[in-house]
Amino acid sequence: MEARVLWLLALVLALGSSSLADQYVGLSENLCAVPAKNRVDCGYPEISPEQCVNRGCCFDSSIPEVPWCFKPLQDTECTF
């Protein structure tokens, strides 16, 4: 009986973790709303959007002459 419970638990954990990995959609838009003049480069020339996002960075190629792969804004936490 105990072995069945362990196998069931392992199965549930494996299925749960794989479904969470598929749901990652990148950083939220508000963290990537960095003004062009404040962008800090996070990549290298010719980096793809996918490679940039995999580094935990934002990608926006709509503005020339500024970094397209850049560090996101820091998520702030309210403390009282």
From Swiss-Prot:
<dbReference type="GO" id="GO:0042802">
    <property type="term" value="F:identical protein binding"/>
</dbReference>
<dbReference type="GO" id="GO:0030277">
    <property type="term" value="P:maintenance of gastrointestinal epithelium"/>
</dbReference>
<feature type="disulfide bond">
    <location>
        <begin position="52"/>
        <end position="69"/>
    </location>
</feature>
<protein>
    <recommendedName>
        <fullName>Trefoil factor 3</fullName>
    </recommendedName>
</protein>
<keyword id="KW-0272">Extracellular matrix</keyword>
<keyword id="KW-0732">Signal</keyword>
<dbReference type="InterPro" id="IPR000519">
    <property type="entry name" value="P_trefoil_dom"/>
</dbReference>
<dbReference type="InterPro" id="IPR017994">
    <property type="entry name" value="P_trefoil_chordata"/>
</dbReference>
<keyword id="KW-0963">Cytoplasm</keyword>
<dbReference type="GO" id="GO:0010906">
    <property type="term" value="P:regulation of glucose metabolic process"/>
</dbReference>
<dbReference type="InterPro" id="IPR017957">
    <property type="entry name" value="P_trefoil_CS"/>
</dbReference>
<dbReference type="GO" id="GO:0005615">
    <property type="term" value="C:extracellular space"/>
</dbReference>
<feature type="signal peptide">
    <location>
        <begin position="1"/>
        <end position="21"/>
    </location>
</feature>
<feature type="disulfide bond">
    <location>
        <begin position="42"/>
        <end position="57"/>
    </location>
</feature>
<feature type="domain" description="P-type">
    <location>
        <begin position="30"/>
        <end position="73"/>
    </location>
</feature>
<comment type="function">
    <text>Involved in the maintenance and repair of the intestinal mucosa. Promotes the mobility of epithelial cells in healing processes (motogen).</text>
</comment>
<keyword id="KW-0964">Secreted</keyword>
<comment type="subunit">
    <text>Monomer. Homodimer; disulfide-linked.</text>
</comment>
<dbReference type="Pfam" id="PF00088">
    <property type="entry name" value="Trefoil"/>
</dbReference>
<dbReference type="GO" id="GO:0030141">
    <property type="term" value="C:secretory granule"/>
</dbReference>
<keyword id="KW-1015">Disulfide bond</keyword>
<feature type="disulfide bond">
    <location>
        <begin position="32"/>
        <end position="58"/>
    </location>
</feature>
<dbReference type="InterPro" id="IPR044913">
    <property type="entry name" value="P_trefoil_dom_sf"/>
</dbReference>
